[in-house]
């Protein structure tokens, strides 16, 4: 299924004394995991696995650089290490990625850089492309080439977005049959979160994505993630994302040629070894940064 064609469910707003608004919404597209697209290709092969491991390694490097090497304190790193375990990523590769993130002398590989590219699609959709690379020139050249092939060009677009923290969780295993959405909502309020999205089961990739997405202020990300972990929720993802501002977000209709071209653009970008995440100024696109086949 082309995830762009998934239809959003009804959104309802909840207002509390803290003046935070919590939302429930349908999941428009598959989740944020940049390697899930590779994993789900019908013709998985050694090359696809190599790219998958490479992106996991980049993610670990970035997570360690941003929040440190202790998975007890770094929720993003903890989820990446769990993903690495599931695909049997070599222990030596994991250790080297952690050391590179720390900048430890003797770690294998060149220095890595985190780069964000801002671009505008001809349709008016803005993109923020996040890359982790050990070769700035290679990354810039290849990413610009992909953008040009789809008529997009580098342009300032960050003003179209707001930065937020995102935590994806599954219900505590021992409470799966007894907990209701209201219980998760209460936990989100207690954690100091801003919004929560209840994700329909048919929109979930069980390995990579959570049943609930919680949005936070960037500074509260670790606090909220730790709160949910302390209540035995399974943390599927925890990181910073760019959310399009509602007043400037583009509403791209279903069966629109723009959808098809953006689908192809993002497919091509995610095939690039340096690209980690892509954010779009499409309405509700904080639910849809990866477009699955």
UniProtKB/Swiss-Prot annotation:
GO function term, MF aspect, one: translation activator activity
InterPro entries hit by this protein: Integrase-like_N, TACO1_YebC-like_2nd/3rd_dom, TACO1_YebC_N, Transcrip_reg_TACO1-like, Transcrip_reg_TACO1-like_dom3, YebC-like
A Pfam family recorded for this sequence: Transcrip_reg
Compartments in which it is found: Mitochondrion
Annotated S-S bridges: none
Alphabetic keyword roster: Mitochondrion
Keyword Mitochondrion in annotation: yes
Gene3D superfamilies given in the database record: 1.10.10.200, 3.30.70.980
Record family assignment: Belongs to the TACO1 family.
The protein, known as: Probable transcriptional regulatory protein C8D2.12c
Organism: Schizosaccharomyces pombe (strain 972 / ATCC 24843)
